[in-house]
């Protein structure tokens, strides 16, 4: 049998259905698929993609840039933003393109991307955008790049609760295939409900590679026919009142979300539990894959799950979840186990919706039946721990020597793992030749604050550097500390990317507060930590120097390996001096 011909171009060739892609590439293909599906439906739409680069969505912008030629042919505009909340605001504008009769297309569907801190800082923009709504043939997907174990962030992030707070429904894919599937459902739901749709993009998902079905007709969107639209519909409108937007969101849009999720079966039973189900497992996204691995470790396929009375429910939309879906799932069960990483989003809805129902089952998740930690909020979940939890409770209903032996082996393996010492720990360091390697050194007796970027690593080195803030807050902490400290002065490291993103406001605030602080703006013209991309806007050393002088900085100097590279006549601010990097300590 001859091998199927494969090309690197297949991933964006919509004539090919079976494709080999990463999660990032799947998101690029997703935009192409939506455009073509609209075309086949008789719509002339465009797409607007914007956001701020950052891991775990760290190379998404590169994938969109590389696909620029094919995207341009399909009216898909990729436009990196200065920061996340401005990207969200721009996407809100994309939904207004047809409102005044000035639109060039039938609609613009949008995609926002950012990591957890970007979701944090965009809350107000999300709230305003979701209140005003989406266009009928537009819709917006918000990709939240969550980092549950803080592998590339200053904090461990779980962004779902931010979207719940602004009432944006959430889809949580388990694998690359569902990135495409849920993306298409997400845009359709956004159009139907008039609300944005969030798509959770953990690095375990988007950084995976898989062979997927990229057929244009794979996903069959069903529009609910039992939902009564209010007068004027749910989409964005001109002259809308604030209280009218609020009322529509609470009175109609949430119900529209539930109707869409239910009719499209985004939450579905995987194993019924056979004729006499006793235990039900509810899970979502990456945790669903962990549960499937746990069941494999226990030797439980669908047949044995049904034999043992184990029902499995896969959630695609963790918020909102309908009462009817949960009561249907829980019917006849004695125990419900909710498996989800970080804080409990699904478990609290299960408890709320099942409370007071007939034959209400016991519900465990974060804590067990006795109130002890079961699946802790911190860190990530381990499939072996999930397997032990499920296996032990199944053994309370069935006697099976093989299952008991498997649970015992897993317990022993976890005990051995807990006793294993980490003997190969290595502290990250700057790349060879990186200017940060010398720029972050401070004079003896001085101290510095770190910030967001590679120079965060200076805290792990012998550089008297300790402490950091959120992105864009660098140095503002000294405004509050300085009046109460014996120390007269500190240094603050600030990357050029962060300066452009929002850090310039912190410098302005420090100047206005009159505190004694030296900002070391570490310029290397690259977002080195997330792919080496150029800083958006192509800012220059000359531009930054003039901005700092205009803000009122007492003294501005430039330290460089190549003082001679700036030609005579360069428009520096008055009094600026240029020094060689060898003189850094003297300058400081």
Regions found by a protein language model. Name each.
Residues 1-176, 202-204, 273-275, 282, ...:
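Thiamine diphosphate
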Residues 59-65, 90-93, 121-125, 150-159, ...:
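Short acidic, glycine/serine/threonine-rich loops at helix termini
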Residues 333, 445-446, 553:
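Short, well-ordered alpha-helix to beta-strand connector turns
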Residues 1-30, 34, 173-430, 435, ...:
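Flexible, low-complexity linker and terminal segments
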Residues 69-82, 131-143, 221-234, 514-522, ...:
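A glycine-rich helix N-cap at a beta->alpha junction
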Residues 146-196, 202, 228-241, 488, ...:
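Conserved thiamine diphosphate
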Residues 134, 145, 459-463, 476, ...:
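Catalytic or ion-translocation cores adjacent to nucleophile or general acid/base/metal-coordination motifs
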Residues 49-51, 142-144, 313, 338-340, ...:
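Short internal beta-strands
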